[in-house]
Amino acid sequence: GARCAYTVDGGRRGEVETESFSADAMTVMFHGFNTHPGYAKGRMINAIKVAADFIQLLPRDRLTPETTGGDEGFVHPYTMQAGVERTSVRLIVRDFTRPGLQVKEALITRLAEDAVGRHPGSRATFEVEEQYRNMKEVLDRYPEVAEYAREAVRRSGLDVLEQPIRGGTDGSRLSFMGLPTPNIFAGEHNFHSRLEWVSAADMEKAVEVIVNLCRIWEERTPAGSRPIGRVV
């Protein structure tokens, strides 16, 4: 089987990416009590209003996708299903370290409990789902996998560009499944927006890098022990 792999899913020409976010999804379920609104005095507990208070308590000028960059993580509420009896808020949590994820998830829990405290009789339950982890944790143990990619970029006449991915790739999961998988550029821009586009010239250059990468593995690996590489 393969000893390593490379995804071709990056942006600017020359990029070699070995570090990604660590990512969790978190669901906060707010529980209220529904009854006939005409006779609800002193009885109804509206879970929608509890959730609204929770969202109001979330940070606005920090820890959000629109206020963070570089090595900063964030908390992002992205969808909700609302009803008087139950309202769920789905969030994604991103950081480059596992402790950073835990700090942000503890913040979400505390703010949700603060919102519940404003509405006697309501309660909140929490569910955390692991999505992927920072592939750097694995790739640091196999430095030649990324170094060969850097050399392939240089052989193609490009400068190597490296910075953490503020997102994830298939390599984020593959690396933790035992297949160290850095990411190589493909000329993609404006990811996940209505204005997403890809450069044909950069795609051609990415192919050249892949060919050089295959040659480097051939050169550096003793005959009889050559790994089977994959390009995803």
Q: What role is predicted for each listed range?
A:
Residues 1-47:
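Fold-level recognition of mixed alpha/beta catalytic cores in primary-metabolism enzymes, strongest
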